[in-house]
C-alpha cells in the first residue's frame, strides 16, 4: 500500500509560516506605503550601511548611551539565512538582550522588526510614554526614518549618545503621548 502525502491547506501553511517566521506578539505591522518610503530613504541616504538591522543597532547603541544603559529588545536581529546568521559587531551587543528571529528577505518584514525594536527601546528608556495603538506602526517608522536621517556618513561614529537620545525623545513627542496627558 502506497501512502500518499496530504497537501497542506492554506490555513495550515499560514499557521506554520506564522509560527516559524515572526513573533506576532512583538512585531507591529506597517503599511506598504511606509515600507516603500523607508526603503527609498535607506537607498538614498548617506549612511554607509544599507542593512536595516545595522541601522537599528546603531540607534540602539546611541539610545543605550554607548552600552551604559540596558535596553531589553524583544526583536532586533535578522538572520539572513539559517546557514549564515547575521552577526552584529560586539559593541552593539553591550547592554542589549537579543532574540534572534528567522525572517525572510522582504522589506516589509524588516520594517516590522525595525518598528518593534524602536518601540521597545523607547518604552524601555521612557516608561511614561505610551503608544497610540491605532497609529503606532506608521508613526514609529516615521520616527525611525527621521532619527536615521540625523546620522550622516561623516559623523555617525562620533555622534553624541546624549544628543541622539534627546533628539529621539523630542521627535517622539510629536508621535506619542504620555500617560499624564
For the regions a protein language model found, what residue spans apply to each?
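Short, basic amphipathic alpha-helical segments that act as recognition/interaction helices
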Residues: 44-78, 117, 121-162, 174-180
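Short Lys/Arg-rich basic patches
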Residues: 2-43, 77-119, 164-181
Amino acid at each position: 500500500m502506497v501512502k500518499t502525502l496530504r497537501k497542506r491547506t492554506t490555513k495550515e501553511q499560514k499557521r506554520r509560516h506564522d509560527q516559524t517566521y515572526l513573533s506576532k506578539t512583538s512585531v507591529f505591522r506597517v503599511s506598504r506605503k511606509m515600507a516603500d518610503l523607508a526603503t527609498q530613504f535607506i537607498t538614498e541616504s548617506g549612511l554607509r550601511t544599507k542593512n536595516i538591522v545595522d541601522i537599528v543597532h546603531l540607534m540602539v547603541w546611541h539610545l543605550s548611551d554607548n552600552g551604559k544603559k540596558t535596553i531589553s529588545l524583544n526583536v532586533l536581529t535578522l538572520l539572513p539565512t539559517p546557514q549564515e546568521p547575521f552577526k552584529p559587531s560586539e559593541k552593539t551587543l553591550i547592554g542589549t538582550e537579543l532574540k534572534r528571529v528567522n525572517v525572510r528577505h522582504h522589506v516589509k518584514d524588516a520594517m516590522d522588526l525595525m518598528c518593534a525594536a524602536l518601540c521597545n527601546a523607547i518604552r524601555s528608556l521612557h516608561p511614561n510614554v505610551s503608544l497610540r495603538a491605532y497609529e503606532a506602526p506608521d508613526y514609529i517608522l516615521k520616527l525611525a526614518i527621521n532619527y536615521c536621517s540625523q546620522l550622516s556618513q561623516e559623523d555617525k561614529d562620533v555622534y553624541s549618545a546624549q544628543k541622539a537620545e534627546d533628539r529621539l525623545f523630542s521627535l517622539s513627542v510629536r508621535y506619542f503621548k504620555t500617560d499624564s496627558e
